[in-house]
């Protein structure tokens, strides 16, 4: 006992460094990006007492067993869906190929593994009041089934309105399916969920895998926000269910976000995306509904659902393809700006082509380390010729892309490593000049409420502040 006493701390530190070395080797072998591998390996080698536990939580970005299990579940889901003769979009897909605008999206159907579909109708929903008024109205009018998926559901005023409405519709005989992310909705009380289940609502939490350790796994989160009512009306965008998304909670209020409402053949793609996630959580299919007929005209839409089990880094490639497609302008709004090398290079090249490249970012942080890393990338973007704007009234959370005069995309994907490689995301692309004009007007209103970062400001950043930003950027691949 006398021998171990003085040396116990030394043994403990040596053990931590040994485990850190093993974890560093694991990071080099498994983390998807070189930047992420280097960041994890160095921190695990030299500071294992600070980074070993976070690595177990954040670092397993290519957990092969999970990815294989998810792919197997997707295959089983598609086998089950084939038995339902789920062929909703043949005529609409052919119509899309005959469209002159189809060429601008030629890579997207292969990238997203879903067809580009014609004859859709889309409506822009600006901010929380418009979004949840439209969603709740659609649910009130539901007759058959409601598919409801959000990253975050809070037990607050808005969450309780949703709770009461879902119970009411379930009592009327409508099939209600609710899917929320276990980490994103970690504060949702059990009584909230159990009350819905007691009322006949099907509720599942999206989790990576079972097991004690995976309760702390914050990678592979389901960040999608999807609502489908009766297989006819769909919603997708950036909002979650909570009072802060209505701009009711300082210091981030007023909250700026965007959703889109859609009808037409692309709603079938929304249902299929929901079905994949529901099948993973429940090992059964939700009701999938096709309307008797679709409109004979409308706009071109492409759903892009991305996730860590994809054969490609779908979300990152989406941004690269959208930026490369621009000949006149590409305007992007995101709460976080931590691009990978491919996306940042695409932005640089767009500037060199003479494209009007603009980024709209928040002026206040919700996560300080992420904001610091984002700020350094924003400074570098300004120096590369990108026009960077900071939205000043409140927190900007919308995820919108506008390319030239026809192409727009609205959904859940941020411009950061987590959306690019670790989370499940969904974006709705629309090819239509009139809708793009609506998005343009919305963004022009946002730019009018924003402060443009000048070249001089980017040079005036204090050295200590720059040091903090660079440290934050160093760990940005693992944020």
Curated annotation (Swiss-Prot):
Could you tell me the keywords of this UniProt record? Cell inner membrane, Cell membrane, Lipid biosynthesis, Lipid metabolism, Membrane, Phospholipid biosynthesis, Phospholipid metabolism, Repeat, Transferase, Transmembrane, Transmembrane helix
Which GO MF terms does the UniProt record name?
cardiolipin synthase activity
Q: Which InterPro entries match?
A: Cardiolipin_synthase, CL_synthase_A, CLS_N, PLD-like_dom, PLipase_D/transphosphatidylase
Q: What class of enzyme is it?
A: transferase
PROSITE patterns per the UniProt record, alphabetical: PLD
**EC code(s) of this entry:** 2.7.8.-
Pfam families per the UniProt record, alphabetical? PLDc_2, PLDc_N
Transmembrane regions listed in the UniProt entry: 8-28, 38-58
- Residue ranges occupied by any PLD phosphodiesterase domain in the UniProt entry: 218-245, 392-419
Q: Name one GO biological process term.
A: cardiolipin biosynthetic process
Q: Which residues form the active site?
A: 223, 225, 230, 397, 399, 404
Which is one Gene Ontology cellular component term of this protein?
A: plasma membrane
Task: Kindly give the PANTHER family that the UniProt entry links to this protein.
Answer: CARDIOLIPIN SYNTHASE, PHOSPHOLIPASE D
Concerning its family, UniProt says: Belongs to the phospholipase D family. Cardiolipin synthase subfamily. ClsA sub-subfamily.
Q: What is this protein called?
A: Cardiolipin synthase A
Lineage per the UniProt record: Bacteria, Pseudomonadati, Pseudomonadota, Gammaproteobacteria, Pseudomonadales
